[in-house]
Amino acid sequence: MGKIKIIIPRILITILVIFASIQAYAASCPIKIGGLAPLSAPGSVTGGEAMREAMLLAERDINAKGGVLGCDIEVVITDTEGLPEKAAAMMQKLITQDGVVAVGGGYHSSVGVASKDVANSRGIPVVFAETWNDTITGDMQKYIFRIAPLSSWASGVIWKFAAQAPGVKSVVIVTENTDYGIPAAAECAKGLSSKGISSVTFGVDIGTQDFAGIVERVKAERPDYTIVLLTGEAGFNYAQQAADAGFGPQDTMFHANQAGLESKAWWENVPDGNLAFMARIGVPETMYSDSALKLAADYKANTGKDGIESYALEAYDSIGVIAQAINEAGSTDGDAIVTALENISHDGVLGRIYFPYGSKKSPSEDGKGSEWWHQWPDPAITMVQYQKEGEPSNTMTIVYPEVYKTGDPIYVD
C-alpha cells in the first residue's frame, strides 16, 4: 500500500503537467487568425473587398470541417489602407489587442514590407497572400512566408510578353512609387533592355487620381507598348483617362494592373478598356480543382461577380495553410507553427502549397537567391486579355505562356 500511495500522486502530477503544457500552447476558443486587407483608400479597395470575402469563406469552410485543435477559428480582418505605417500599426494591434496566433492576407507590397518586422519580432507566423516585393522573404526571417509570386518572377512574365509583341521597340512604364511599383518597374526596364527595347518610367505617388499630366508625357514618348503598374482604383482611372486622350487599351498595346480582373469594376470604371492585357495568378478556371470550383461558385453567389480573382484565391489559401499548420503543430505556439509550415503539403485552391526552403535547406544550396526563403515556388502566372466589351474576367483569353494559351492576342497597331 505504501508504494501505491507514492505512485498515484506521481501519476496525477504527470497528468497535470501534461495538461498544463497543452494549455500553455493552445489558445482559448475561438482561435484567432489575422487577415490583412486594404478596405479604404488609398489602398486597392476592390482588391481588399475580394480578399475579405475569400478569408471569411475560408473561416466558414475550416470551421465546417471541425476547426483547429477542437476550436472554431475567427479571422480578424483589419484595414491596412495600403499604407506602410497603417499596416505596421494594424499588425501590432492584431497581435497585442486581438490576440491572433498567425496572420494571412496582405495585398500591397508596402504592407508586407512594413508589417513583417512587427510580426517576426513577436514570433507570430505570417503567410502573405499577394505581396510581391522580393525583400519580404529576402531577409530570411523565421516567421515570414509567402504564397504570392516574387516580384522579379511576376514582372518577368509582363516584360517578356511585351518584348515578344510585334514591332515593340519602345515601352513606357507608369508605376506607383511604392514597394510594389518601384522594383517591378525596374525589373521590367532591365528585362526589356536585355532584348534591345528602350523604356521610360514615370512614377506617381499612391493615391494619385488625376493623370492628365502623365498621360500627355506618355503620349509625347510615342511608345509601342504601355505597362501600367498602378494598383486598384488608380489603375482604373489612369486607363480611362489615357483612353479619353486617345492613348488607352484600344489605341496602343496596353498592360493594365490585375485589379482589372474584377470585371464589373473594370467595365464600370474603364468603359474603353477592351483589349487591355493583365497578369493573372493561378491556372484558368477550366483547370480548377473541385475545391477551387466550389469556392468560385460560393464566391460568385455571395458577391454577384462573374468570377473569382487571383488575389481572392490567394487570400483563401493563406488562411487555409495556416489552419492546417496549427493542426499539424498541435499547438498555437509560433515556433511550432513555423516548423509545421516548413514541412507542410497543403492542397489549396491554387494547387499544392509547400515551402522547399527554410531552416532545413537554404535557397543557396540550389543556387537560388535569399528571396526564395519560405517562398511557394509553383504559382502559375498567365497573361490574359479582354477581347469583348463587357466580358467577365473568367472568360478572358489566355494569351501567354504557351502552356496555358486559349487564344491568340489581339494587338493594336
Predicted regions and their residues:
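Beta-alpha junction/loop-to-helix N-cap segments that form part of ligand/metal-binding clefts
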Residues: 45-51, 65-138, 147, 203-212, ...
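Extracytoplasmic "Venus flytrap"
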Residues: 31-56, 78-85, 107-108, 174-182, ...
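Periplasmic-binding protein-like
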Residues: 35, 94-107, 127-129, 170-175, ...
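Segments of small-molecule ligand-sensing domains
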Residues: 301-309, 323-395
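Short, low-complexity disordered leader/linker segments with a strong preference
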Residues: 1-32, 412-413
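Extracellular/periplasmic Venus flytrap/periplasmic-binding protein
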Residues: 89, 133-135, 142-245, 285-294
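Signal peptide-proximal N-terminal region
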Residues: 28-31, 52-75, 196
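Extracellular/periplasmic periplasmic-binding protein-like sensory domains
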Residues: 242-316, 327-328, 399-412
